[in-house]
Amino acid sequence: MVDRRAEVVGRLKVLEESAAPLISFLQNPALVQELRSDQQYNLQMLQERYQIGSDQIEALYQYAKFQFECGNYSGASDYLYQYRTLCTNSERSISALWGKLACEILMQNWDVATEEVNRLKETIDSKSFASPLSQLQQRTWLMHWSLFIFFNHDNGKNGIIDLFFSERYLNAIQTNAHHLLRYLVTAVIVNKRRRNVIKELIKVIQQERYTYSDPVTEFLECLYVNYDFEGAQQKLRECEEVIVSDFFLGKQLSENGFVTIPLRDEFMENARLFIFETYCRIHQCIDIGMLSQKLNMNYDDAARWIANLIRNARLDAKIDSKMGTVVMGTQSPNIYEQIIEKTKVLGQRSYALTSNLILTSAAVTASAAQ
Amino acid sequence: MASRFWTQNSDSESEEEEVSDLEDDIPLGGEGGGALPSKYLQGDSDSDESDDQGPRMVRSAKDKRFDELVQTTEQMKNYMKINDWVQLQESFERLNKQLEKVNRVTESVTAPRIYIKALVMLEDFLNATLVNKDAKKKMSPSNAKSLNYMKQKLKKNNKLFEADIEKFRANPESEVEDEIDEDDEDAESADGFSDDDIVERTMNSDEEDEEQEDDGGGWTSAEKKPKEMFPKMDPGQISWEMVDKKLKEIIVARGRKGTDRAEQVEQLSYLARCAKTPAQKLEVMVHVVSAQFDVNPSLNTHMPIAVWKKCVQNVLVILDILAQYPNIKMDETSEPEAENETEKGADYEGSIHVWGNMVAFLERIDDELFKSLQCIDPHTKDYVERLRDEPLFMTLAQNVQAYVERLGDMRAAARVALRRVEHVYYKPQEVYEAMRKLSELQSRVGGAAAEIVAGEDGEEKDGEAVMKASTETKGPAPFVLTPEIVPRRPSFPSVNRKLMDQLVTLIYKHGDERTRARAMLCDIYQHAISDEFYTARDLLLMSHLQESVMNMDISTQILFNRAMAQLGLCAFRESLVTEAHNCLSELYAGGRVKELLAQGVSQSRYHEKNPEQEKLERRRQMPFHMHINLELLEAVHLITAMLLEVPNMASSVHDMKRKMISKPFRRLLDINEKQMFTGPPENVRDHVMAATRALSKGDWKKAVEVIQSMDVWRLLGQRESIMEMLQEKLQEEALRTYIFTYSPYFESLSLDQLMVMFGLPEAQVHSIVSKMMIAEELHASWDQPTRCVVTHNMEPTRLQALASQFAEKLNVLVESNEKAFDARTGGGGLEGLGRRNKEGQDYADAAGGRRGGDFGGNRSGFRNNRGGRGGRDNQAGGRGARDNQGGFNNYNRGNQGRSGYNSGYQSTRYQDAYSSAGRTPYQAGPASGINNRGVQQADAGGRMVSLSRVGSNRF
């Protein structure tokens, strides 16, 4: 251990020394001001005025890496930031970006980390990699790392949907990392405003079913593909376990001694809503007693819950309290309306056509007359 | 005795082939003890005429040739009597020509007895004439000239047949007495040899020598011919220069009109034995192989099997040499005549270049094997025998691949690997196992035989030949001994998947585009027959082959079709009905399955094919053992079509615009319905039609019964599970059909009743009905407390449906009016009209596929049909978009660079699929379908606007 320590310290010394000129330069804010956006100029200037060449810059990178390995993340993050402004090697600059992201995640600076993710994403997308394969790998890595951020950041649920649903990343999930579907599905279920993507998500889930399925994806499948409500209930219970045991999803929050798992509660609530909504869509008449059972509520709660839904205009239904049922309103397109809709524009179009025709013939006769 | 002979003879004459078989043996049949084939033949032909064998006058070509020989000999006798040397000279020349012909027909090199007899006669007469000086003086000048000419000619000629002549002189009369006995023996011995043996022996004079000598030693004949190349010389004295000179001579003669190809092979193989240095031997061997390829000049027929085998052995020898002397390089670039490099001996260190291309040889050998399998009738034993040669080829390919890899030529290695893949890919595990066992068995037998003779004979021979070879070799021993270095048995991994993976990975890494594409298709095929549908499908989609295959050569397209067919069967086995139908529907769309799969030619009524095309087509045919069973394929296609189409038809009784899923199926159904009487089902189609009728009434039990009674199912492996799957699918579809058809007439349907009617569990019925509700196919909803479906009776009445249709037609009418107007005023004439027409259609498509039933129905139906091909294609679109935009497609075998596929290929084939997206559950990428549609709509819309603007601006 002592040997190891000596070794580490020795290495630290060496690296520090080699990177010293640059670090001292960078630590002087006045001097940093002199740096401009033009990289070539910067390099030249450093070379001429401070004798800082590519060796030192390289040393800075190594130094930052070493700092990172030693656990000094903020230092590493700073150095890497500086390094990037000076770096010419694109491979290295990507490594630096990754390093920076790692630092931010480890320091739990979620906002900064989000920025880093976006920056990295841009680089990956814009850069023409030697092989598509490595690009794919980079993307996959990015998605994995971003999980740390998305499930800790406030706006993470939106972010994850945005990132994962963007075409290329969805492809990457499908080809390389099916297990990420779980997080995507969870995020979609929890996120009320992003209902529209659910159809697409189901397609993806179905497509990849043969390689990957877990209770969370199966839940959606039961609900939207098989319309198997019993199965959905069953899966929902399994989901709960999965969420609790999952590192990202089951993050615990302790408040006043109570340990809560916010995501689980949110998930369960939304999932219940999903089930109910779908159920209502295909039923005309539902027994509240049965419903309350399915929703794990007592009768009154269920009735109140439904009434709330109706009041919020999320549901076109009425409660028949005498029979203890919910009666759905049906809306179906009227055939007459349909036909009227179809033929409405025809007259207009024909009229326009005739008038055009007359104009043309007039023009033709006019030109003939001339 | 005699009767036996005659009966045998008559048997053989009744069957042409056997005649030739027997006749083949005749010159050789004498091995037993100086038989006289000529007499035998004479007797033979006599018997045809004199004996009462019936009115048969069928005579083989050989008979005729022999007759000619006999005739000429007779003529010569006459000329001798009148001492006419001019005529005699002519006859002699004719005789020689005829001899050649005879030999070619019988594929032998020995001269027939009668020829020798003629020679002897001639010689005697010549000598007599020369002695008689008076007579000589009396001759006319032309006669004397001829005499001199004959003197020289005969001397030269007789040298060739010296041994024969001597033998003949030894017992000139024997034939007369023993004729019948001999003939009998002939016939018997002829029976003893198979055709192959004979041809093989005749093909290689070396072995022939040995065999004949040990067979009793008497019968030596014209096959000494090659030795004539170095007359009167002990083989040991032949120098490098001589061999080289001779080789060049032979090569120059190659391809000339008069050159006998078979003879060339002999000469060359003799040269190979005489070769002085390994490099020279190699050089000669290369020429031997190419000469062997030349033996069969026609593209349509295959190389004789014996030659093929010899050829394989020769190539193996070449490989041996190459392995033994790594300093010898073989390439195509080196100038064959550049320098006398081959003179350098075995101990020479530097590199020696020899012209030649192993891979080309291998490919040619493979082609010949393929061709022979095409030609041989698959129901004969020959075919099976021929199939047994496959391991031999695999050995060779393996060795060649090893050699090329040693050279570091990975591209060539990929080519060889592809050949190997193409021999393995269509084999299911069981067949593969059989092949492996066979090859092990063969090598064991071969190995044992090799051990027996190993001590005495260092030469290269295949097992069979070795066993027959004599213990003493009197033929000239080869100067360059080449020990067997390369393994003579193929090493097969125990699982064919392993072999495939190994080879395919190599190809993906190093092959060119075509090789890779073919390997990929083989890989897909292999996955499909081993029931790995998803792997196969992903491979297909990620490689984008379905887009680029249109640009490839025909045989690759056939391979693609085969792979698709297997994929369809595989999907069916995995009970993925839609996928199966999508895979197969395209094959059946044109009704030319046989041609598409290259499993026979279908007669087309509409256009006659010219012989050229037919020949080409025949050349493309798959050998029988690679066939995909067409009946099974048709059954699967029709059943999947039925499962999809019947509910579809039921759901769209009123509106015509609904797309058809399977056009061929509909057509069949129409034909079937027009029939006045329908008998009990006989073939696949009848069965499916009967099932369709039952299914459309919701009678699933009958449908299941009919379908399960088909006999094609015995071709399927897991029959039980597939039958179960079919039953379940039929039940489901029957339920859907029933609901579609009869729901308008019900106020409510009880869940329990449905369960009982269709024998399905509650959850499934509930799920199916719910699905229909959500998809708005069924206007109804569940009434949970009473467990029944309450229909809303939203189905329009007939009048309403007609009104709706009418409205749509009006729409189309207006649209076409507008188009006509635009075409007139917009300028651009017909072309513009066509173009705009197309755009208009796209627009209509994009706007929701709203198109009239009859108006332009043909075309729109077609488009709809194609567009609606559904899942697979759209999915392809989805995945395609995903990869195209991502700019990468990895398949984790590490085959990068395949991205070459996805750029630049504008596939017309799947355009429709792209534009009709959003209908199927597959749409992977959001951009592919929905955006596409949006864009198109906007685009088309924009154009419409601009058109009308043009119209109005004009005034």
Model regions: which residues?
Chain A
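Charged, E/D/K/R/S-rich low-complexity terminal regions of large eukaryotic assembly subunits
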Residues: M1-I94, W98-Q370
